[in-house]
A protein has these predicted regions:
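Short, charge-dense linear interaction motifs
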Residues: 1-216
């Protein structure tokens, strides 16, 4: 049996319509139980802040959580040593909402001035990532079909049935990150918002699929 193998490439440009704020809470405390308690209290405080902007407490989603031992280096008689100082927690969370610069400015101002002072970064995504992935895959298959048709005509053969379709099924990152980290910015005391004027660029995606046809 003779076959032809063709790899098709799909490309897609998406206009992001969802704003994502990723926040990180951190702290170091002498006792493990104390570290857990503070991590829980800080998370609840963050939920309190966000609830003032129309978010349900369940809208704040955990991306990762860890507690690790923390050591510090010191020098003793020309020898560097380490000593245990406690436990460090790191809690990464996210919240998403339909893109709105005015709302975003108020949220970022509140985060910058709240007691727990999380580190945060801003990114953008789309409201229906699954539909985007399916459209991208469809474009890749269509590209493979068109290439196979051109090649088979040029070679004087006919395409028959598809023998196999090979696709990696890897996760496609549908996210645009204009800034990786945001720090506190100076703002007049009477203000309650940052003036945000962000127009995120389109998200460009690409993926490939390999199709094998029988030919005659």
């Amino acid at each position: 049996m003779r076959t032809i193998r063709v790899t098709g490439k799909g490309q897609l440009r998406l206009k992001p319509d969802i704003t994502r704020i990723t926040m990180t809470l951190e702290g170091v405390y002498p006792e493990y139980s104390e570290t857990l308690q503070h991590s829980s209290e800080d998370t609840e405080a963050l939920k309190d802040v966000l609830s003032g902007f129309g978010f349900a407490r369940s809208d704040l989603k955990t991306l990762s959580f860890s507690i690790d031992t923390e050591y510090e280096s010191y020098r003793e008689r020309e020898v560097y040593k380490q000593r245990f100082i406690g436990y460090r927690f790191q809690h990464m969370l996210k919240v998403e909402f339909s893109s709105d610069n005015e709302r975003l400015g108020r949220i970022l101002y509140a985060l910058s001035n709240c007691a727990v002072s999380p580190e945060f970064r801003l990114s953008y995504t789309v409201s229906d990532p699954e539909a985007a992935r399916n459209e991208l895959l469809g474009k890749a298959v269509q590209d493979a079909k068109e290439k196979a048709a051109v090649l088979s005509r040029a070679a004087g053969v006919s395409l028959r049935c598809i023998e196999s379709i090979d696709y990696s099924w890897g996760e496609i990152d549908i996210e645009y990150r204009p800034m990786e980290r945001m720090a506190k910015a100076a703002q007049p005391l009477m203000a309650a918002s940052y003036a945000m004027d962000i127009e995120p660029d389109d998200i460009e995606l690409s993926d490939t699929v390999t199709v094998i046809w029988e030919i005659e």
